Amino acid sequence: MHEMAVCESLLSAMEEAAKAQNFSRVTRVRLAIGRFAGIEVEALRFGFDVVMRGSLAEGAELVVLEEDGSAWCFDCCETVALSHRLASCPKCGGERLVPNGGTDMKIKDLEVL
């Protein structure tokens, strides 16, 4: 379950931000996660609760904003929106697609004290 490692990295990023911005508590974390990022949201929520225990983000609300995926279609030479990684091109039905959006996870913002 790599979501635990993701949560540990998230905690490290929050601790660095706390030092740089001089805050001591995180009450809410908003993450943008692409559909193709390979993150299982429920596993992430579980990991978040476990990893944040005893930290500056213990009890913080985790808000997940799911971002659509997109891909470049080699057949019609268009960037198209996709709901899942194995979908065919919605414009031409082609299957030669390379994901180019919705593959990452970003911290959108933190609510802090």
Swiss-Prot record:
The keyword Zinc applies. Ni(2+) binds at residue 2. It holds the Pfam family HypA. InterPro entries: HypA/HybF (IPR000688). One of its GO terms (biological process) is protein modification process. Keywords: Metal-binding, Nickel, Zinc. One of its GO terms (molecular function) is nickel cation binding. It comes from the Bacteria. Zn(2+) binds at residues 73, 76, 89, 92. Belongs to the HypA/HybF family. Involved in the maturation of [NiFe] hydrogenases. Required for nickel insertion into the metal center of the hydrogenase. This is Hydrogenase maturation factor HypA.
